[in-house]
Structure formats: structure tokens, C-alpha cells
Amino acid sequence: MYQAIPYNANRAWPAASRPATAAAAPPPPPPRGEEEEVRRAVAECPVVVVGRSGCCLSHVVKRLLQGLGVNPAVHEVAGEAELAGVVAGGGGVALPAVFVGGRLLGGLDRLMAVHISGELVPILKEAGALWL
């Protein structure tokens, strides 16, 4: 059984162990293997959704595609840096990113616009993600 630690107003909190300069340091570059993994998934799968782990927008993209009968491959990354090497030009890529037929379709806003206009199903059929 666990014991609760009683609250004591006189007890001081432990000091932070990291130096103040560590917060200003830029994050380390992403591992090259992650970028290659995304690139391979985009080349092999008809529909790939690249997003952050637990992102609600990625969930919406996945549910929309599943509602149309597509089972997208979902790849979770830490940030846009891993995705920049996959897209030609690399600029202006936001997560979640949807790749259809090996090409970048766009984010959630572009996916919704194409879906509302009725162009999404023909694009998915052309990519081989839908058979009906």
C-alpha cells in the first residue's frame, strides 16, 4: 500500500538540477532514420497521415479517411523537422500532413476543402486507396 506524504509548509522544495542555460539551447536535430522511415512510408502506402502523437487534428484526419473506407498509415513524429526533408521544398509544412499517392495533399484544412468539394474520393481512387 502506498503512503501519502503529508504536506508541510516549512519544508523547502528541492532545487532544480538543470542549469539555466540548458533552456536556451536549441533542440537536437532529428535522427536521420526517422526522416527515412517517413519517406519510405509515403512511397509504399497509398495514404499516409503524418502527425504528432495524441494530436486531435491527426485523429480528425484519420477518422475522416476511415469514414470514406480508407485505412491510412499513420506515422507519428516529434515535429515538423522530420517532415521537412520528405516534402520537396520543405517550407510551410504543418502537421498533420496527408500524403496521397506519394504526393503531399496538405493538412486538415486542405483535406476538408477537397472532401467538401467532392474531389477527395476520385483522388483516393486514383491513388489505389479505394476500390469502389
From Swiss-Prot:
A motif (Responsive for interaction with TGA factors) lies at residues 129-132. May only reduce GSH-thiol disulfides, but not protein disulfides. It is found in: Cytoplasm; Nucleus. Its main location: cytoplasm. NCBIfam families: GlrX-like_plant. It comes from Oryza sativa subsp. japonica (Rice). SUPFAM superfamilies: Thioredoxin-like. Residues 16-38 are annotated as: Disordered. Keywords: 2Fe-2S, Cytoplasm, Iron, Iron-sulfur, Metal-binding, Nucleus, Redox-active center. It comes from the Eukaryota. [2Fe-2S] cluster binds at C55. The lineage of its organism: Eukaryota, Viridiplantae, Streptophyta, Embryophyta, Tracheophyta. This is Monothiol glutaredoxin-S9. Belongs to the glutaredoxin family. CC-type subfamily. Residues 35-131 form the Glutaredoxin domain. GO terms for molecular function: 2 iron, 2 sulfur cluster binding; metal ion binding. The gene is GRXS9.
